[in-house]
């Protein structure tokens, strides 16, 4: 634990080593066709004031991981969750989110831990005004009266730089543009000053200009508040500029985890190497000739069906470096001396052997 002292005498604020520590998280669903293992033995940490990015293609288990952590999955016999999600709150108390009684989890969800969902149009209530939706959270968690809550909702809309906020606070979601709705989602998430923000593809449906504005807004809010962020995305270009740590997921498992700069400079897992090679800035190096014409590089094949996973490494059917042993065993996530980890039986790239610059 690290301790930092404030400007006030005799006041010491203890900063936890980890804001969230996820250990061996697994989530599966029983269906008529069989058991779907959406998340398998996932572990990662999020430090206070830092951003951890969870990266992977669609279907890799990123969103299910976030919904599991927030306890938003359907509570039925068909859903099975194991592992730990150890959250350290502002008082220094460490809580396993997966084991808390539901009333206690409700007091944390939307308060100490908030979430921005992928599609704001389906996440916002169409029959309530923007102001009413933000005020509801403030009344519930901060026990404000209606007048104070609405006044604070207006200040939050101004904080996320929504123009004419006094007018927008009285409007409904369908009256706002996609970029404005996403700013509303950020205001809603920030309403109760969360210590941890989970952002699930927060810029997917936005154009490049609005995307950059939203990401810059989130960065400034993080600097101002000191919150931690779990950033879920498939966009490695965004990750390169906005994350501190990266965990790469494939078929429900983390296949590589490292600080952002070493991961981009020396990707260890073939899947990570393939994702980086697909970036526009890398295409000139990896373009392939087909019938005399250059084609953009792409990882061949597609993710295997979760109902029929390969017997060994899940990435083996698509891997250009696979050997016979890859079809026989699921590799462990092995940790290097430098704190990096990768789930691959192939030899690691020596430190310093490869250096490449990655741009968005």
Regions found by a protein language model. Give the residues of each.
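P-loop NTP-binding/switch modules centered on Walker-like glycine-rich loops
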Residues: 198-202, 206-288
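A short, flexible loop at the N-terminus of ABC-type nucleotide-binding domains that lies
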Residues: 15-19, 28-41, 72-78, 89-94, ...
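ABC-family P-loop ATPase nucleotide-binding domain
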Residues: 1-28, 334-360
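Short coil-to-helix "N-cap" segments within the ABC nucleotide-binding domain's helical subdomain
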Residues: 33, 79-86, 101-107, 129-158, ...
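Conserved ABC ATPase signature
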Residues: 171-176, 180
